[in-house]
């Protein structure tokens, strides 16, 4: 299913950008060093919240993709559960609709 693969790739790229940019949101008095896009252990709430949200979003969308692939492997093509899972995936892409890589077919 190329449409699922393209959407997963698009979301993965956006989340990778967010993970990289999370390091920009440390508080001014943060003693922790920032190393190559990774957030060190510190008490700044914003980077940790961004990284936690991205990890949760990845997990949910990965579960949706696995459901679609599993049903496709069993010969079910776009069952109700697959359609619902794909709608969830498209909802996660909606905040990025202004990105040049956005495809209108991803609108929920």
Question: Where are each of the predicted segments found?
Answer:
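Flexible loop/turn and low-complexity linker elements, especially glycine-anchored beta turns
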Residues: 2-10, 41-62, 85-108
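Aromatic-glycine hotspot motif
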Residues: 1-35, 54, 58
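Amphipathic alpha-helical oligomerization segments
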Residues: 17-24, 45-80
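Functionally engaged cysteine thiol sites
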Residues: 26, 30-33, 42-44, 79, ...
């Amino acid at each position: 299913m190329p449409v699922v693969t393209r959407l997963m790739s698009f979301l993965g790229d956006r989340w990778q950008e967010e993970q990289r940019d999370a390091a920009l949101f440390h508080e001014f008095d943060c003693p922790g060093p920032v190393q190559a896009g990774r957030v060190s252990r510190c008490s700044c709430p914003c980077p940790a919240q961004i990284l936690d949200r991205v990890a949760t979003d990845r997990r949910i969308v990965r579960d949706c993709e696995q459901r679609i692939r599993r049903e496709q492997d069993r010969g079910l093509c776009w069952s109700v559960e697959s359609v619902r899972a794909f709608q969830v995936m498209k909802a996660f892409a909606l905040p990025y609709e202004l990105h040049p890589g956005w495809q209108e077919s991803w609108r929920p």
